[in-house]
């Protein structure tokens, strides 16, 4: 079951023809995935303001009823329809323009689609089972546009095919300056001694809520120094450990990058602190 513009449908193919054509012709502009635990939306305010900021960047029309309360009601509607109200789940919110902009109407109305699936956040640190590698066929777009979830979506699809064909756990994406941005799964963090570093938003990495949550945990942890700055592929090979942050896993430790095999240490500590704050939120 899905929710589309406030109504519940059994499947996307059951949408009215006009709405389905709008989705097909215009495509999804904004995507946001949130976690829900027994009906409680985790970090909902942070997700909501990120979605609104993304709509403004893309000059999308924001209806007056797109309040935190209204969208929360719609999320609960899709959870109830899928019998997930008491479970752990991932909820996906997608927003797209209902029509093409014209000279007379440059800011068009925005439609939304909400889906949900059962998914529990890991109770222990997840460790990759395969190595990760650099993806060099195409580059991430730098700047504000690159921070949006959907901006480099086609590139990520191509990279996913490459990862599956070559049996990699994940792929590291680079921008036109050949600097590390993120991985297919999420924000990548490099550990060297007590210093933990990740690429800046200006590199083209997605400005996800969970990326910022982990940064906050690092900055509050004694004995850890956080830096947001350029990372070269060579820097990764000199790291003591690497980990990736996403809404799906929280923190996932990288097993191997090229010939370098990593042992999680800082990632274990950070995951413990993160999962505590997650449960209390």
Predicted features and spans:
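Short, acidic/charged, Gly/Pro-enriched secondary-structure junctions
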Residues: 69-102
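Helix-start/capping segments and mature chain N-termini
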Residues: 1-77, 105-281
């Amino acid at each position: 079951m899905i929710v589309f513009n406030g109504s519940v449908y059994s499947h996307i193919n059951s949408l009215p023809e006009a709405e389905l054509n709008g989705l097909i012709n215009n495509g999804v502009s904004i995507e946001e995935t949130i976690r829900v635990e027994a009906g409680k939306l985790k970090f909902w305010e942070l997700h909501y303001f990120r979605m609104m900021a993304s709509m403004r960047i893309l000059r999308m029309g924001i209806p007056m009823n797109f309040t935190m309360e209204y969208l929360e009601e719609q999320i609960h509607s899709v959870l109830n329809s899928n019998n997930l109200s008491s479970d752990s789940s991932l909820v996906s919110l997608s927003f797209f323009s209902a029509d093409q902009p014209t000279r007379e109407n440059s800011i068009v109305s925005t439609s939304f689609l909400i889906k949900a699936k059962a998914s529990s956040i890991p109770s222990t640190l997840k460790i990759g089972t395969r190595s990760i590698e650099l993806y060099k066929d195409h580059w991430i777009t730098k700047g504000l546009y690159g921070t949006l979830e959907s901006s480099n979506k086609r590139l990520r699809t191509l990279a996913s095919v490459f990862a599956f064909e070559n049996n990699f756990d994940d792929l590291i994406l680079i921008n036109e300056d050949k600097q590390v941005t993120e991985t297919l799964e999420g924000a990548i963090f490099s550990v060297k001694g007590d210093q933990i570093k990740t690429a800046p938003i200006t590199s083209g990495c997605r400005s996800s809520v969970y990326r910022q949550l982990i940064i906050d945990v690092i900055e509050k942890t004694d004995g850890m120094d956080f830096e947001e700055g350029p990372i070269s592929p060579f820097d990764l090979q000199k790291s003591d450990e690497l980990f990736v942050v996403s809404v799906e896993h929280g923190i996932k430790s990288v097993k191997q990058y090229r010939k370098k095999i990593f042992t999680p240490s800082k990632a274990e500590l950070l995951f413990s602190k993160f999962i505590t704050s997650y449960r209390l939120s």
